[in-house]
């Protein structure tokens, strides 16, 4: 496949909405043409959170959520098409990540589960859909994540400059784009996830806008050291994690050991945990000249400021400055991965995921007619 118009659909660990993006893609270029964020119904968000955090469930509940998410993703695509004034005939394919409800890369056997029925997406939109990207990498011994570093490399790598790309969603993940070295990438730990959970519990707000609440508090050093002593942070790459590990229950276990901390100080400490866990990994890799940040966390001035302070000599900037929307990066990546799949080309990087080989990712859900 030489070129086409693709739609990427992403619902990440932050659960702050369905990101949908339209892009013209060929071998040399990814040109974003439109984007849209579709709301996530509150009850559906609660259902996802319950499943992600290990609450008991049933096959019926899993099947129902899979169908509901497929319908929601299709509605999001149709809303983007209406906004852009396009029809199904204008689109080559959809790349849909799905909603991760469980990720167990070190299980015996390892597995990952993303919900959102791709059959329904293809049927409702009348557009061929590519989905289920992660499990093929796992079948070859990889962690199934992260997959976005391959896209970061295609778009943002430089021949001489040491660059790293940091996506701060619910989980923070880092792509190391170092000249003459294999691409590496992994989840550094929590991004916005714990901060969002804490402010929701204490102030009924979905996120800490402009880090206003965190800025009103102070870092609690004993709590920071306790949280950072979690074995995940010292684990070597390849590694990946998610809400099934870093969640409100994990935070409560830490807080129970050091009771009486002011809520705003907890928030400040969680922001510091995100910044510190990223900065440590950047330094361990020998540093970089530019750290390009995307995702919702790029709008957190405290996290951005702290990373700049912890990384002297590194320019901490946003991917928007380099022509790639930070809000749409992951959705763009899955549009690009759909292009790679339909072109018969690999989408994973074994140096990132630990897979035994490069492989074409995902499954294709065609439409019989439009």
Curated annotation (Swiss-Prot):
The record ties this protein, via Pfam families, to: AnmK
InterPro entries recorded for this chain? Anhydro_N_Ac-Mur_kinase, ATPase_NBD
Catalytic activity as recorded in UniProt? 1,6-anhydro-N-acetyl-beta-muramate + ATP + H2O = N-acetyl-D-muramate 6-phosphate + ADP + H(+)
EC number(s) reported in the record: 2.7.1.170
Q: In which pathway does it act?
A: Amino-sugar metabolism; 1,6-anhydro-N-acetylmuramate degradation; Cell wall biogenesis; peptidoglycan recycling
An example Gene Ontology biological process: peptidoglycan turnover
The GO terms describing molecular function are: ATP binding; kinase activity; phosphotransferase activity, alcohol group as acceptor
Q: Which domain of life is it from?
A: Bacteria
Q: What does the entry list as the binding residues for ATP?
A: 12-19
Q: Does the keyword Transferase apply?
A: yes
Gene3D superfamilies, sorted: 3.30.420.40
Keyword Kinase attached: yes
Q: Which UniProt keywords apply?
A: ATP-binding, Carbohydrate metabolism, Kinase, Nucleotide-binding, Transferase
Q: Which HAMAP family match?
A: AnhMurNAc_kinase
Instruction: State the function annotated in the UniProt record.
Output: Catalyzes the specific phosphorylation of 1,6-anhydro-N-acetylmuramic acid (anhMurNAc) with the simultaneous cleavage of the 1,6-anhydro ring, generating MurNAc-6-P. Is required for the utilization of anhMurNAc either imported from the medium or derived from its own cell wall murein, and thus plays a role in cell wall recycling.
Which family does this protein fall into?
Answer: Belongs to the anhydro-N-acetylmuramic acid kinase family.
Name of the protein this chain belongs to: Anhydro-N-acetylmuramic acid kinase
Look up and give the organism this protein is from.
Yersinia enterocolitica serotype O:8 / biotype 1B (strain NCTC 13174 / 8081)
